[in-house]
């Protein structure tokens, strides 16, 4: 069984077997008897590596043995291995030639946080969002068959990701085309937060049967032995009355279901995978793992150790005076929703499996009957809110910008067309840093402002966030407030829940010649630049409805209008300004500053903003360049 470590090593560990096995070809030269020692070395290397850089942590620890077994049994990269989401892919990266570069993990020009096709031939499909792996592996399996290839396609998906409808769409389709593929359910009872819903309960009931394997003839040919009784007992729920054969759900869909087996038992994993490798058609293997396995603190607190920051040096200087920390924007939202829930009993909070990330823990504890975690099901979350709004509730959907993309049709068809009172609290808007382009909130202003009837707001600091959340909540019809990851400028936050006038911006600095129209948290940078250029700075607040009167007035009194946003320039807030000027037949020089028409690669947020010219230096340079052109 795996060794359990109690501390993250600060010095690179001695790993003689891993030194020989940093590619799958090297791994396959090892004897099976050496693999359990290799697993301990790989786990220790992962602890050391992530301790140096920070990053996703618990999920990778839980799939050490599975990762070794997959690369040992299958002919990767010819056999296609697809990791769902990618939080668990660090051991895979270490074993596929990237060990020496793991010190650059999540850093500018370094190893990406998630599998990337451009990074390695072993990363057969780029991921980051949940529940895509089965569809991707199915597509690969079909294409391979059309090309006359016998290669295997393998999807590794967690029980959390299996709560999303897309996964079941693929599970339903694969048997129809008799796809030669394997789906591995990594069942650790976790996604990021604990799983919820009927499917999670169903999987737990599967674990409650200790004798099911002997009841299935097919399993006898595949499983070398059952997992330890103590492991099953630990995960047991009361046996579901009348459930004779676990896995019925998957078998009824047309899959050959095997399991569950112990995902930390390497001999069993290898023997089972070898047998399943030669089976034709859609195969489904259910493995039971523990998130954070092998690191004692993570086993106790898998949510807290989902990801970690890098270790501070032992000799780092200790500041005598504590720095006053600004509140996180998500924290401001978390306080606001509790305050508004106290004031209005109609408020309900909805999140797709991001209770901790969206800062809804306090709300869920204080108002449990009004809190709804729908699991990884963004489409359902939006339409659930629509249904609640139809009956007089006031739903607040707390969701990351990048994940709202997955519920866009529901936002349009089910909420906006019916003009329902739903507030979208859109977290992680703009560039998010080390997680890279799959998690950036680059497009929400563009895809929201084209929807008729919606109010779209961009707060510039913590106090503005609270005000605009109240404004959106009290508005009749759909509304959206987008705010970034991290902390604000430590603005004084007013305790009231008063709204502001919809569609009205605020002049924050009066200057001349140049006017900077700010949509969001770049207000601080704009004010720095304005002091140098004696420019006017306007906090626009609203992308939709746009303060057209203020834009018209400003255009008449300034030589150059500059729009500033942390959103794609194409179709964003700046485009809204230019569209208005065109409709009003106002000829004016306009400079749009925002995210360029590329995917901005992972780095620290400040580095990403500088790369896009959205720091104070870049903003000033762009304005001076335009002023030079217009004379």
UniProtKB/Swiss-Prot annotation:
Parts forming coiled coils: none
Binding site for Mg(2+): 159, 188
The protein's Enzyme Commission number: 2.2.1.7
Enzymatic reactions: D-glyceraldehyde 3-phosphate + pyruvate + H(+) = 1-deoxy-D-xylulose 5-phosphate + CO2
Pfam assignment, any one: Transket_pyr
Molecular function GO terms recorded: 1-deoxy-D-xylulose-5-phosphate synthase activity; magnesium ion binding; thiamine pyrophosphate binding
Entry keyword set: Isoprene biosynthesis, Magnesium, Metal-binding, Thiamine biosynthesis, Thiamine pyrophosphate, Transferase
Record has Transferase as a keyword: yes
Cofactor: Mg(2+); thiamine diphosphate
Recorded family membership: Belongs to the transketolase family. DXPS subfamily.
Protein name listed in UniProt: 1-deoxy-D-xylulose-5-phosphate synthase
Species assigned in the record: Pseudomonas syringae pv. tomato (strain ATCC BAA-871 / DC3000)
Name of encoding gene: dxs
């Amino acid at each position: 069984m795996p060794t359990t470590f109690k501390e993250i090593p600060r010095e690179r560990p001695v790993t003689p077997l891993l030194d020989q096995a940093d590619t799958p070809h090297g791994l396959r030269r090892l004897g099976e008897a050496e693999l359990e020692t290799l697993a301990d070395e790989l786990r220790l290397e992962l602890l050391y590596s992530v301790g140096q850089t920070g990053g996703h942590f618990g999920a990778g620890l839980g799939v050490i043995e599975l990762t070794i077994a997959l690369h040992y049994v299958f002919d990767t990269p010819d056999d296609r291995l697809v990791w769902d989401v990618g939080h668990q892919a660090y051991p895979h990266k270490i074993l596929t030639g990237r060990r020496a570069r793991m010190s650059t993990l999540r850093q500018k020009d370094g190893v990406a946080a998630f599998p990337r096709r451009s990074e390695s031939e072993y990363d057969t499909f780029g991921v980051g969002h949940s529940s895509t792996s089965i569809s991707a592996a199915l597509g690969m399996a079909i294409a391979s068959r059309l090309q006359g290839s016998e290669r295997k396609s393998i999807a590794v998906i967690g029980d959390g990701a299996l709560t999303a409808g897309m996964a079941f769409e693929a599970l339903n389709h694969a048997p129809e085309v008799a796809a030669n593929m394997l789906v591995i359910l990594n069942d650790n009872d976790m996604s990021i937060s604990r799983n919820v819903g009927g499917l999670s309960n169903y999987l737990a009931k599967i674990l409650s049967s200790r004798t099911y394997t002997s009841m299935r003839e097919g399993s006898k040919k595949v499983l070398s032995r059952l997992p330890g009784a103590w492991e099953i007992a630990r995960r047991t729920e009361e046996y579901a009355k009348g459930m004779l054969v676990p896995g019925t759900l998957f078998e009824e869909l047309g899959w050959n279901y095997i399991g569950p087996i112990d995902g930390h038992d390497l001999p069993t994993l290898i023997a089972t995978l070898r047998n399943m490798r030669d089976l034709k058609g859609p195969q489904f293997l259910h493995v039971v793992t523990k998130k954070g396995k092998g690191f004692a603190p993570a086993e106790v607190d898998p949510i807290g150790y989902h990801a970690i920051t890098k270790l501070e040096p032992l000799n780092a200087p200790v500041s005598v005076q504590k720095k006053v920390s600004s509140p996180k924007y998500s924290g401001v939202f978390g306080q606001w929703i509790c305050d508004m829930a106290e004031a209005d009993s109609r408020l309900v909070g909805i999140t797709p499996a991001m209770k901790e990330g969206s800062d809804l823990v306090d709300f869920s504890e204080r108002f449990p009957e009004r809190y709804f975690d729908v699991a990884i099901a963004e489409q359902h979350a939006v339409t659930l809110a629509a249904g609640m709004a139809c009956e007089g509730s006031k739903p607040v959907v707390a969701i990351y910008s990048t994940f709202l993309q997955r519920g866009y049709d529901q936002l349009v068809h089910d909420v906006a067309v019916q003009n329902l009172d739903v507030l979208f609290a859109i977290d992680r808007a703009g560039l998010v840093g080390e997680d890279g382009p799959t998690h950036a909130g680059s497009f929400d202003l563009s895809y929201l402002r084209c929807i008729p009837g919606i109010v779209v707001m961009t707060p510039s600091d913590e106090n503005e966030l609270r005000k605009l959340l109240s404004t959106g909540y009290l508005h009749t019809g759909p509304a959206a407030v987008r705010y970034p990851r991290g902390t604000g400028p430590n603005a004084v936050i007013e305790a009231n829940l008063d709204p502001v006038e919809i569609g009205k911006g605020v002049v924050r600095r009066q200057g001349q010649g140049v006017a900077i129209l700010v949509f969001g948290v770049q207000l601080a940078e704009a004010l720095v630049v304005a002091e140098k250029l004696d420019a006017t700075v306007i906090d626009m607040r609203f992308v939709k409805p746009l303060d057209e009167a203020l834009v018209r007035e400003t255009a008449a009194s300034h030589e150059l209008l500059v729009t500033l946003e942390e959103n794609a320039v194409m179709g964003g807030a700046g485009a809204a300004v230019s569209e208005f000027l065109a409709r009003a037949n106002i000829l004016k020089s306009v400079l749009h500053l925002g995210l360029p028409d590329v995917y901005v690669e992972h780095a620290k947020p400040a580095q990403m903003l500088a790369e896009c010219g959205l720091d104070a230096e870049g903003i000033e340079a762009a304005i001076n360049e335009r002023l030079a052109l217009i004379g």
